[in-house]
Amino acid sequence: MASSLAAQLSQIAANSTNQLNLKAQRLAHSKSLIFDKRVAGSQDFDTIYDICYDGFRELCQLDFRFAQFERSIFSEQSKVQDRTEMNVEQNRELDSVLEAFLALVGGRLLLSPAVKAVEWLIRRFRVHEYNTRFTILTFLPYYSTPVFLNLLAILPDDLPSALKVLIPYKRSAINPVRQALVQNAISNRDLITTLNNYVLQVCRQRAHHHALLAFWAGIITEGVAGMLDSSRSGRRNVEKQKHDDIILQILPVLNDGFAMKDVSELVIGCYMVCVVLAQKAELQDRVLDGLMEAVTGSWTEETMSSGLICVAVLAQQKPDPILPKRVFKAMLRMKDPLKQLADISTEYKTSQLLLGLVAGCVDSLSTQKDSARLELLSSMFKSQLLNDADTAKAMTFVLQAASAVGGTISLDTQTQIAEIVQHFSRSSSLQPVFQKVIDESSIDLSVIEYNLQTVIESVPVNKAIEDVEMEDADKTETATDGYDSALESLAKESSFSTSFLTAQSIPVFDKLVQTFALSAGSPERVSAFVELPVLCKANATTSPQFLSFFVRVFTGMYPAGVKAAALKTISSIVSSAAWSDVDVQALLPFMLIALADPSERVRSGAVDALANIGKVVDKKKKSGVWARDSLYGKSMHIPWLSSSDFQKILERAVLPELEECRSDGEHIGRALENALRGAASDSASAIKKPLRLAFFTYLCSHAVHLPLFAPRAGLLNLLNRVDKAGGTTRTKELEPLLKKWRDMSEQEVAEVHEKEQISVSDFEAQVLKTVTPKEKDSINLLLSTVTPYSPSLRASFVSSVFNRISEIWGKVPEDRQITAAEKLFELSTQASESPLVDNARDLLRRVELPGPVLLNYLQQIPASITDIDSLGPAPKRRRTSQNNMVAMTTKDEAKLSKLMDKMTFILELVDGSSPEAHPELTEWLFQTLAALHHFKSQIQSGMSYLLSLTLGSLLAIVNRSRASSKPQFDTSVVRADLVVDCVRTTESPQVQNTALLLVAGLSVIAPELVLHSVMPIFTFMGSSVLRKDDDYSVSVIDQTIDQVVPALIQSLRHQKRDVVSGTSELLLSFTAAFEHIPSHRRLRLFHALITKLGTEEFLFAVLAMLANRYSMDKAVLVLMTGLVSDADATVELSTYSKFLNLVGDSLKSKPGISQVLLGIGSDDGREPHKVAADLLRALAYLFKHSSLKVKIARALTTETDDSERIRALFSNILEQVLAIGESMQSVKPVHQAAGDVLSGLFSTLTTIDFLDTIEALLKRPDDALRRKVLSLLATRLQQSPERDGASQTRMLDFLTVLVDIVQSSPDILLKHAAVTCIDRITEKYGKKEPSMVTSAAQVVASASCIGQEDDRIRINGVLCLASMVEVLGQAMIPALPEVLNRSLALLELSLETNKVNARLHDAVFTLFSALFVHLPYMVSASHLDRLLVLSFKSAASDEDLDNENRQEALHFMARKVDMAVALASIERNWTQAVSAGPSATHEVLDAISLSIEKHPKSATMKNLSVLTTILFRAFDLRREQTQSSESAFDASDLEEIEDLINDVTIKMIYKLNDTAFRPIFIKLVEWATGLPEKNTQGGLARLTTFYRFLQVFFGTLQSIVTGYASYIIESVVSVLETASPSNPNTKSLWLATMRMLRSAFEHDQDEFWQSPSHITKISTPLISHLRHATSTTTGALVATETIPTITELAVAADSTDNHKELNTVLMRFLRPSSASLSSSSTKRAGPGLGGDNPQTRIAALKTEQALTEHLGEDWLALLPEMLPYISELMEDEDEGVEREVRKWVKQIEGVLGERLDDMLT
C-alpha cells in the first residue's frame, strides 16, 4: 500500500469524476450561436426548443422541404435525446438527418429563422462538436459575416485538418479573409477535396444555393489555378507528373458535376475549372476532346452560353481544329450558333472552334442528307468572325473538300459549295485572302471548277493551262462520270415537241440538264450535246426547243459554269447567219435576268450574247418574232414589240450599259429603272413614253405568263424597282400575277420550291411588292386578295399580305388610312375563326393609327352597349336578382361575348397608340368609362381589364397635361365620380392603383371637380391598396397622399370647417387599414400622411384612433412610438395634452369631437369607459417608450425658448391625468389606466424631480393614489436606478418618509408598497449610507412590519430583511436578535398544521440563506438547532412547499457555518431528522456531504470524531428501521439513503490518510460484526449495510484498498456459509456480498487474491453457491451474480495451481454428488455439494463458459481434467444441460482452433 493514501485517493477521485464533470457539461451547454454564454448557460432545453421551433416553423413556410424534419430533430422527443447515450448506429442515422438539414438550411443562414433553427442543432445535438466539418462547410460561404464569427467562437479547439486555416481566426475572434482560404486551398488539397465532396452532397440533395456555389466556384477555380502554378518545375517530366496528379484529383469532381445538369451554377463552376485546366495545364488531345464532349453533353438553355465559352477555350488548346462528332452535332443543334459565338468572341478566342465547325461542315459531303451544314458554312464566311489567317485556313478546308468530291455529290450540294467558293472571289473582304490561298497552296483550281461546274472569278488563270487541264480532267473523268452513257441514252430520244419553258416538270429536261452539266467544261462534249435530236438544233430558228432549253438553264438555280456554258451556246448560235432574219426579242427578258446574276461569269456570258444579238439586229429589216406563239404555250399572249421598237430598246437602254453590267450585277436594275422612268426630252437617246409603256407592259406580261418561277423571280426583282412607266403602274400590270400566286395551293408552292430551289418567302415578298403605296387603292387591293376568306388561301400568303400593308401604311395618306382602318376593324371583329381576324388585329396594333380613327373606335363602345342593353333583365328583376346573367339566353351570351371582345380590342388599340398624344380622346374615354360602369352593373361583372385600359389612357393624357401650363383638354368633361366608383367598386389592384393615380393627377389639373368625392377614395385605400406591398402600389399611395391631401385640407380651410373632423373619414380609412399594411411600410406611410396633414393638428387624432381601434396591439404601439419620436418636445407634449382632452371629452355625457373621431355615442360605437381605458393605456406606453425624457432634459438643460412652455404643458398634463383618475375612481379600468399614465408621465422626470413630485403627492389623503405613487417609485428603482451622487443622496433621504409610513400608516397595502421601496432603495443605494438603512431594518424587523398579522407585509418584510443582510453585512448586527427570533417564529407559524404558508416559509429560508452567506457566525447553536428541527418538519410536510429555498439554506449552512458548529447541531438533531422521514434524512446527509467537500482537510480531521459518530448512526439506520415497529423508510428509501451515506463516507476518506482511516475501518468491521448472536436480524442488517459500503469502497478506491479485504475474509466466509438467495431474510445480504466480492476481486493489482491463504478460504464457499441454482429463478440470480464473481476471482487468482483448485471444486457441480465425490471429499465439502439438480449443472457449465471466455487458453490448460465430465454431460438426460455443454464445446474449439471429437472418443 502506498505511503500516502490521501494522494492516491485524490488521483482516483480526479479520474473518477471526469465523466461527471458538471462544470464541463455546463460549459458545453452554454455554447450558443445566438445567445450570450451566460444567458445560454441558464436556459433549459424546453426554453431553447420553443425559441428554435419558432424559427423552424418560419422555415417551413419558406420551403416545404423543411417539414420532413418536424418528425425527427424538431420533434418533442428531440428534447430528451442525448447523443452521448446513443449507440454508434443511432448516431450514424442521426448524423445523416442533421447533415441533410444543414445542407438545406445553408442557403438561408442570413435569415433569423434559419439561425434559430440551427441553434437547436448546436444546443441539443452539438453539431459543432460531432459534425464539425459539415457545420463549418455549411457556414463557410458566409465567412465574412457576423454569424460565421459566432460559429468560430463555439467550435472545438481541434478542428479537422482540412479546416486548420480557421484556427488563427478562431483564436483572434476575427473573420477569415478570402485570400487565406484560397492560399490554403492551394497548399492543402484536403480543403479542396472536402469542399468538393460537400458541394456534391448538397447538390445531390438538391439543396444547393447561390452563396454556396458561387463561393465554391471561386475557391476551386483559384485553388486549381494556384496548384497548377505552384507545381511548375524546370524539369518537364516532374511538372507533367504533378499536373497529372492534380487533373486526376479534379476530373471525378467534374464528372459528377456535369451529371447534374439541372444545377446550373454547379455546371458553370465546372466549366470554369475546365477553362483553368485548359489554360494552365498541357492537356492531351484526348483529354481535351473528352472535356469538350462532357461540356456539350451537360449544357442546357441556361448554361449554354457559359458552356460555349468553355468549349471555345478548350478548342483553342487543340493542335488540330477537328471537333469530336458529338461536339459538332451539339453545336449544330444550337439556335443561331454563330450569333452566340459572335457575342463571346469579343472576350474569348473562338478561331479554333470556328475552324472545327468549318471542318465538320465539309466532312463527308457525299453523305450529307440536308443543307443545314452548308448553310451554316456559308453563314460563317459571311459573318466574318475569323481573322485573315484563320479565314485562309477555313478556305483551305473548303477547297480541299471541293477538290476531293469528284462526281459523288448531289447537284444541290454542288450548287451550294459552288456558291460558297464564288463568294470567296466576289466578296471584297474575302477576295484578297482567297487570292493568297490560291497563290500559296497546291490546290488545283481546275479540278475544283470541274467538280463544281463553275468558274472561280477574279483569279488569273493561264488559259492554255486551263484548257489543257480541263482536257486532262475530261480524259480522266470520261470513264467515271457517266457522261457517255447519259449522252447515248439521250441520243435515242426523239425531238421534243414544244418549248422547254412551258412547264415546270419536264422529265427529259432533267436528264438533259444533268448531262449538260457534265459536258459544260468540255467544248467537245458541248458540241456533241447540242447535236442531240431531242433539242432540234436544225429547227432552232423556227421552233423553240433548242434555245428554250438553254434559256431555262441559265435562268435556273444551277452552277455558274453550267449557266455560262448555256449562254455561250446561245451566243454562238444567234451569231450565225441563219439567225439574221429572226427577231429574238423573246430572249430579252431572260438576258436581262442573266445580267443581274451574282456571278460575273454568267453576266459576261449574257453580255456577249446580247452583243451578238445587237449585231444581228443591226442587219435586220423586217422579220418574224422567234417563238411568238409557242414560247410559253399556245394560249399565252404576249404583247410583242415591233422589230424597230425592239431595236430601239436594245440600242438605247441595253447595249450601252453592257460593259457596266459585266462588273456590277446591280447596274442593269438601275439602267432599266432609268430607261422606264424616262430621260430629258432633249436627249436623243431617251425612250419615248409610248415605247416605255410598250416595253414595260412587254416585260410585265412575261412576268405574268412565264410558267417558271426562278426566271420570274429574277424578272420581278427588276420590275419592282419601277412604280410606273408610260402611264401605267406595275401594280396594274402585275395584278394578274398576284392573283395567280394567291390561287396557288400549299402543295403547288411546295413543288415550286422543290423543283426550282427558290425561296418561297422571298418570291412571295416580290409578288406583293408589285402593289405600291402610290397606288390609290393599294390597301384595298391587298385586302381584296384575302377577302372574302377562303380555306384554300395559304396562311403564309395571308400573313405576307398584312405584312405588306404594314410596310406601306406610313406612306399612305391619312384619309386612306382612315378608310382602310375601318375595313380592318370590320375584319378584326368578325366572329369567324379565320386567320384574317388575328392578322387584322395584329396589323392594327402594329401601325400608327391617327386620332380620328381612335376617336371613331371609341365612339362605337357606348353605342354598342346601348344596342345590347335590351339583352339585360327587366328593371324589376335587375333590382332583385342576385345573378342577372341567368336571364340571358345562349344566343344573348354569344352577343355579349362578342361585344366584350370588341370593346377590349378597341381599348387595347387606344392604349397602345400613345393616347397622351391624342388629348381629344378625353371626352370619349370618360363616355366609355360611364358606359362601362352602366354595363358592369347590368352583367354583374367587374370588367377590370377594360376599366384598367380606359383609366390608363386617361392617366397618360392627364400626366402629359400636367406638364403644360394649362390643360390640353376641356376639363368640363371630367367625371371624377366615375373614377371614384372605379376605386370603390372594383377588386382589381391594377384598376384601383390606376384610378388613384388618375384622381391624384386630376386633383392638380381640376381640384374643384375632384375633392367633393375624394373621401370614398380613402375609404377604399384603407380596405385595399394600403394592403399591397409592391413598389407600384407604394408609388400610388405616395402620389395620392402628396397630391390629394393638401388640396383637401386647403378646401376645408376655405370652407372654414374644422379640419380634424372634416378629415375624420380619411383618418379612419388609414387607421382601419393598419393591420393590413405591410409592417415595414406602416411608419413611413403614416408619417407621410401626418406630415401632409400637419403634425401638431392631426397627430393626436391619429394616435387616438389607432389606440381606440387596436387597443394595446404591440405593432400599433410601436408605430405610435415611431410617429411621436420625430416630433420635438413641445409638439409631443401638446399632442398628449390634446389626446387627454379627447379622453376627457369621451367621458362626458354629451361628447364632442370624440363622437366624430372615436364613434362615442354612435349606435355602433364602443362604451366610453372602454375607449378611455384603451386610450390611456396607449398613452402610458408612449410615455414609457418614447424619447420624450431625453427631449425634455435637453430642452430644460439648454433653457431654450420652449422651456417655459414645456413646464406649462407638463403641469397641465399632470392635472389632466389626476383629474381623470379622481373622477373615475369608481370605474376601475379607467382609474388603473390613469395610474399607468401617471407612471409613464413620471418616467419622463429625473430622479430628484420625481421624488419631489411624489413626496408632495404622498401628502394627499387618497391612499389609492399614495399606493400608486409608491408602486411607481418601486418600478422606477427596479428598471433604471440613477447613479449620480445627488440622486443617490436624495433617494436615501427619502427612506425616512418610507419608514414613517411603515410605522404610522394603518393601510397594510401602503405599508407593503413602502417596504418594497425600502427594499429597492437598500438594494440599489444601501452601501452608500449603511447607517441610514440599519435604522430602517430595525423598523422592518419590529412589530410595525413583520410583527403584523397580515401575511403580505410579513413576507415582504422578511424578504426586505434578506436584501438588507446582503447589502449591509455587519451593519445589520444591531437588528439581528429581533430578526432571528421573529423570523424563526414566523417559520414555525408557516408550518402549523392546516395553516401552511408556503410564501412565508420560502421567505424565511431566503433570509437564513443570506445570513449564512454574510453573517454565519451570528447564528447561534440554539438558533441553528431550532432551524434544523423546523427544516426537518418542512421536509416531512405533506403540503405543497417549495423545497428549493430550504435546501439552499441548508447548503449555505453546510458551506459557510463553522464545520464543528454545523456537525454538532446535526449530531444533536439526528434523531429528529430520522423521525421526520427519508426527505429530511436525505437533506441532512446532503449538508454533511457538502460540508466535507467545501471545508479543508484540516477541518475534517479536526471534527473526525463527531463526523464518525454521525456516520455510524447513519450506517445503523437499516438495523433501526428493520427492528422498529413503525418504520418510516421502505426498502428503496433505505438503499437511496445508504448510497448517499456511502458517498459521504468516500468523500470523508478522500480527506484522510491511512493512519487516520484504518482505525475507523477496523472499528467499522467490529461494529458490523459485533452484535450478539441472538440478534440475528440486527446482525444481518448491519452486514448488509456494511457490505454495500464495501462494494463502493473497493469499486471507487480500487487497488489501493485491496489489502483491507484481509479484515473481512472471516466475516465473508461466515456469510457465504449462511446466506442464500432463496431466503428472503438473507437475500439482500447475499446480493451485497456477491457484488462486494466482485468489486474486490476486479481491482486486485497487488496479487492479494493469488495468496493461497486468501483464495483457499474464499474459493470453495464461493463456488459452493452454485448449488443454489435449483430453479429458473435462482438459476438466473446465480448466473447474474455468482458466476461473474467466480470469474473475477479466477482472473485475480492468475496462476495454474489456483485455477486447478478452483476447477476441482467447480467440476463437482458438473455431476451429481454421488458420482463426483468420495466419502471424504463429501464430508469435507459439506452436504449438497454436487450437481444433483440440472439447473446446478447448467450453472456450473455457464461458469465454465465464462471462465473459458475470460481466461482462454490459460483456463483450457485444465482441459484434460474436464474431458471426462464433458463426455458425460454430452449424454446428460436434461436437454438444457446438453445444450449448454455443446455451446461450451464450440467455445473451446474456437479458442483452441481444433475439434474435440477425437479427445472425447
From Swiss-Prot:
Q: Name one GO cellular component term.
A: t-UTP complex
Q: Name one GO molecular function term.
A: snoRNA binding
PROSITE patterns, sorted: HEAT_REPEAT
Does this UniProt record's set of keywords contain Repeat? yes
Q: InterPro entries under this entry?
A: ARM-like, ARM-type_fold, BP28_C_dom, HEAT, HEAT_type_2, HEAT_Utp10/HEAT1, U3snoRNP10_N, UTP10
Q: Which residues form a coiled coil?
A: none
The regions listed as transmembrane in this protein's record are 102-122, 136-156, 939-959, 995-1015
One GO BP annotation is:
positive regulation of transcription by RNA polymerase I
Tell me the membrane topology, using the record's own terms: Multi-pass membrane protein
Q: Which UniProt keywords apply?
A: Membrane, Nucleus, Repeat, Ribonucleoprotein, Ribosome biogenesis, rRNA processing, Transmembrane, Transmembrane helix
Give the top-rank taxon of the lineage listed in the UniProt record for this protein: Eukaryota
DNA damage listed as a keyword = no
HEAT repeat spans: 581-619, 1038-1076, 1110-1148, 1244-1282, 1288-1327, 1756-1794
Entries under SMART domains matching the protein: BP28CT
State the protein's purpose: Involved in nucleolar processing of pre-18S ribosomal RNA. Involved in ribosome biosynthesis.
Q: Subunit structure of this entry?
A: Component of the ribosomal small subunit (SSU) processome.
Q: Which family does it belong to?
A: Belongs to the HEATR1/UTP10 family.
Q: What is this protein called?
A: U3 small nucleolar RNA-associated protein 10
Q: Which organism is it from?
A: Emericella nidulans (strain FGSC A4 / ATCC 38163 / CBS 112.46 / NRRL 194 / M139) (Aspergillus nidulans)
Gene expressing this chain: utp10
